[in-house]
Amino acid sequence: MTIKVAINGYGRIGRNVLRAHYEGGKRHDLEIVAINDLGNAATNAHLTQYDTVHGRFPGEVSVDGDAFRVNGDRIRVLAQRNPAELPWGELGVDVVMECTGLFTSKEKASAHLKGGAKKVIISAPGGKDVDATIVYGVNHGVLKATDTVISNASCTTNCLAPLVKPLHEKLGVVNGLMTTVHSYTNDQVLTDVYHEDLRRARSATMSMIPTKTGAAAAVGLVMPELDGRLDGFAVRVPTINVSLVDLSFVAARPTTVEEVNGILKAAAEGELKGILDYNTAPLVSVDFNHNPASSTFDATLTKVNGTLVKVSAWYDNEWGFSNRMLDTAVALAHAR
């Protein structure tokens, strides 16, 4: 069964979802049939073909009337503000990827269902009313056929949860604090402007900017047994892509660097293969650009003092997350 997918909102995540689909070998279980975005179609085609972060698309993108042609495939292009008025039923859309950042609650995202879509995945942390928050590889098995609107969590939660899962299963995570050293994103500013958050008011290109994140606490939505045990904050830094999670936690028993690294190596080679990668080389952030894994554990940075453990993982906050959107779409459509 081929899942028909539509993308609503063609920004960083929307474009990378499309590129990941084609660059990953074009999955035969999924077909992108439509894109809805208020931007000019020719401009969006150009931005798909040429990307500052991920380079030139290794294929062909052109505009054909009311559609894109991507490697010969025709993808309908729409420009409708109200999701309820989109022709999802006419196009046979199984799953809408809601990538605008505007419809992040079940109530708002359900407008796509009124348009005829069967399911919706929000590409951001969802409201409390969503049917599930999913980190593929960690808890996608909880999906049910009755789920209609789900959240794909955040890029940082998608990095953190695969790191925490095997550690909690083998060592027990009593509690922990996380810092994500995060590349700047489009919700920041190039030069100082008025903002209610005085740190967010400052130039993204000139400073390290501490700010809040719900990524650590959201692990409790994915692994309920850890609800309330994790917290943290973000430091936005002047790099365009790739971020680093730094997690310190108290284990339920004493451990060693060797045991911690062994646990995560086994997970990366086993149940989390393709989701969690394992690195032993002395690399820097740019080396993980365009890496499709959700999380790359860096074994060279592990520190242990009795029950106090520090682990670190790199993640391409655009590319890894976009690949998981595709995985989650297929899992949601096939949920029983």
Swiss-Prot record:
SUPFAM superfamilies xrefs: Glyceraldehyde-3-phosphate dehydrogenase-like, C-terminal domain (SSF55347), NAD(P)-binding Rossmann-fold domains (SSF51735)
Domain of life: Bacteria
Residues annotated as site: Activates thiol group during catalysis: H182
Gene designation: cbbGP
Pathway: Carbohydrate biosynthesis; Calvin cycle
Family of this protein: Belongs to the glyceraldehyde-3-phosphate dehydrogenase family.
Binding site for D-glyceraldehyde 3-phosphate: S154, C155, T156, T185, R200, T213, G214, R236
GO terms, molecular function: glyceraldehyde-3-phosphate dehydrogenase (NAD+) (phosphorylating) activity; NAD binding; NADP binding
Binding site for NAD(+): R12, I13, D37, R81, S123, N186, N317
Enzyme Commission no: 1.2.1.12
Keyword terms of this UniProt record: Calvin cycle, NAD, Nucleotide-binding, Oxidoreductase, Plasmid
Active site: C155 (nucleophile)
Function: Could be involved in carbon fixation as a component of the Calvin cycle. Catalyzes the oxidative phosphorylation of glyceraldehyde 3-phosphate (G3P) to 1,3-bisphosphoglycerate (BPG) using the cofactor NAD. The first reaction step involves the formation of a hemiacetal intermediate between G3P and a cysteine residue, and this hemiacetal intermediate is then oxidized to a thioester, with concomitant reduction of NAD to NADH. The reduced NADH is then exchanged with the second NAD, and the thioester is attacked by a nucleophilic inorganic phosphate to produce BPG.
Catalyzed chemical reaction(s): D-glyceraldehyde 3-phosphate + phosphate + NAD(+) = (2R)-3-phospho-glyceroyl phosphate + NADH + H(+)
Quaternary assembly: Homotetramer.
GO biological process: glucose metabolic process; reductive pentose-phosphate cycle
Any Pfam family matching the protein: Gp_dh_C
Protein name: Glyceraldehyde-3-phosphate dehydrogenase, plasmid
Organism: Cupriavidus necator (strain ATCC 17699 / DSM 428 / KCTC 22496 / NCIMB 10442 / H16 / Stanier 337) (Ralstonia eutropha)
Lineage start: Bacteria, Pseudomonadati, Pseudomonadota, Betaproteobacteria, Burkholderiales
